[in-house]
Amino acid sequence: MKKLLLFVVSAIMLVPASVKADEGMWFLMFIERLNHRDMQKMGLQLTAEEIYSINNHSLKDAIVQFNGGCTAEMISKDGLVLTNHHCGYDAIAELSSAEKNYLKNGYWAKNRADELKPSSLYVRFFVRMDDCTKRILSVVNPSMSEADREKAINAEIAKIEKENNEGGKYTVSVRPFFQGNEYYYFVYQDYKDVRLVGTPPESLGKFGGDTDNWEWPRHTADFSMFRIYADANGNPAEYSANNVPLKPKHHLPVNLGGVKENDFAMILGYPGRTNRWMPAGGI
């Protein structure tokens, strides 16, 4: 499964010394039909509508894709974004110089005027998704050559993306799943005025490097903070001194109390891909 998609990756019960996990990846639009009842039995207190809704603000509005490859979270009503240090690494490196080495020394803006704008950075909000399998597969037939099949599918994908981008307001992506047997389109909204708020020194943020990256528990301050700016109406805008912090539809409160035994937990984000359902013959 490709990037750019928003999934519930796993739902788990936190139990000391052992973790019982219902592992896998699921589309948010199928949460109510496939997973919600089991998640409630495990302790989930949110409704399916509070996790994914296209008509009201929901949890999906607080989980964003950061610069095309990472997951990040909205953690304030004023557009503050939390992500990993390694996800913000390129932006931090771009803003650094021999005189102001933010990678080495870290950086914290004392006020919003001190927040720093890298040249190329964006945050992507997930708006909605839908199934377009029947439409895509209706333009192909078994007698087609592979080249003709690909051409027909790509032409239909281009139509779907154009029909749903509302004149360029949204980014639309059609993606194949299950070896091209299912197709879904995803609608996103991109914000490009994203500024660095704070980062720890590289010695903390990248401590352990890729060796520790795959281990748990970790002892790494692997985080960085940014802020999204928008025009006065909350719409995406190019960088301007007149832009204001985005008021997100939803943000996550930070609980300083930590987790307790038997608390419900789940992961919501933008993973890479999975071959979980590949048959034995395909391995």
Predicted features by range, described:
Residues K3-A11:
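Sec-dependent N-terminal signal peptides
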Residues L4-L5, P16-I283:
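Terminal presequence/propeptide segments associated with secretion/organelle targeting
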